[in-house]
Amino acid sequence: MKKDLGVLQAVYPMPVLMVAAYDESEKVNVMNVAWGQICDMDKIILFIGEGKKTWLNIQASKAFTVALADKAHMDVADFFGIASGNKIDDKFERTGYHAVPSDHVHAPIIEEFPVVMECELLEFLHTDHVDGIVGKIVNVKADESVLNEKGKVEPAKLNALMFDQFQNGYYVTGEKVGQAWHAGAGLMKK
């Protein structure tokens, strides 16, 4: 029997995304975004409030990067979610992390995070209920340490963080339990 839990953000898991952009003076800012997802083969949508520093930076620079946070960098990833760039001027510098310019867009790549998408701004979405940023993914970079022998990102090596909205916890992904577009194929024959 199921129990009513009320209104909850009940999508699980959510990725822990590190969104980085330059401000008007080329200063790096990074934000932890749990509410984001792929919305087409080469597009990503991020649900970020319009007044956030990251929103303003992307509006000015027309580009951003989205990195996948991993277990090894959980504390800094969490800091990027609880510290506001509008209130803490040296937010990125406090971490001791390193940024390099993207080769493909005008945005920083945070070297410590192992997988990063380089994105051009496509549009801002404004509705009565949600604000979003849609970006075109122009390239993905990955540290060789998280790639398998076929050159693909290996989830078990990546140790990507997942956000649990039920208990506000971070978890790690990694165990493969089936093959997508194959596990249910037997039911197609019925």
Regions from the PLM with identified roles:
Residues 1-190:
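Basic, polyanion-binding surface patches
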